[in-house]
Amino acid sequence: MGKQVLVDLSHPFGRGNPLWPSNGDFHIDRVQHMPMHYRLLQTFNDFHMHNSTHADSPSHVIPEGAFTHELPLENYYGPAVCLDIPKSHWELITVEDIDEAAKKVEGGIQEGDWVIICTGMNKRWGENDDYFAYSPGCSIEAANHLVFDLKVKGVGFDLQALDHILYTYAAQHGPGPYVPRIVEEYKAQFGHEPLEDYPEWEPVHNILLGNNVMGIENIGGDVEKVKGQRFMFCAFPLRWYMGDGTIVRAVAFIDEDKLNKDVPDRVYKYGVY
């Protein structure tokens, strides 16, 4: 047994971080700065909570659902497994994917676990089509399996949303399409509208959050170091009154001997002076 170490599973946030297609940028002002005031004081004048690594609250999609300040801290903490389920261009995470990946983790998935799903897309985190426009995602069947069969506490994805991109208003749902080119590309590739294959608006959001199962989007940081492992997990929110979700600091508490040591430390190109 090695010592316990903390592994950051979060992307940095701030001005310049990658943005979901409809999200506005951070606007940050320096009210005081060192040369003049001998202190630094910054204000966020425009701050989108559904940015970078964040947890959605039920009120985000469920009428009269719980707001962030109403959720107990226990919801954001507990034993976890990180499943290695490689996915790419518009692929779906299936029930079979989850069950097969769980067999490779100590103890499998147990009732009340957090399940962190590592598709490898965290490595493409950036303002590019791979991460956003062509994002894979969780199938309806897999979401139901996690909630009703496996009875998990929460699910975190290294993806742009809890849902496949074609279940969102980036495509044909709600006020969409915010990214009309993916609709045209899908029609050219498959010969029909994506709406035929992805008819519901954010079904995975509704399945998870509608049953008080937590959901985290954009898991990142050094998640590749804990892939295939069991550990303790936390992703505590800001105590935002009436919030529908907040940026979180997702962290794995794990024995250092269990780390995937061939994975280098994650270095981000943005947020570097």
Regions found by a protein language model. Name each.
Residues 1-273:
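Active-/binding-site microenvironments in catalytic and ligand-binding cores
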